Amino acid sequence: MPFVTIQFLEGRSDDQKKALVSEVTDVVSKNLKAPKENIHVILEEMKKTDYGVGGVRKSDI
């Protein structure tokens, strides 16, 4: 029962997230030979104010 967690910054559309879940499921199923119904994809959308790189928040760039 594979679990895939994807963290990304806010701003993606519902259609983009739907496509991501579908395509990641396909790739994991193919490579691990796991049934699609056993694959869990967790999307963790982060606010730009809650994420920083090099000491700078993404919201401040």
Curated annotation (Swiss-Prot):
Annotated protein name in UniProt: Probable tautomerase lin2709
Broad enzyme group: isomerase
Residues annotated as signal peptide: none
Catalytic residues identified in the record: P2
EC numbers for this chain: 5.3.2.-
An example Gene Ontology molecular-function term: isomerase activity
Entry keyword set: Isomerase
Protein family according to the UniProt entry: Belongs to the 4-oxalocrotonate tautomerase family.
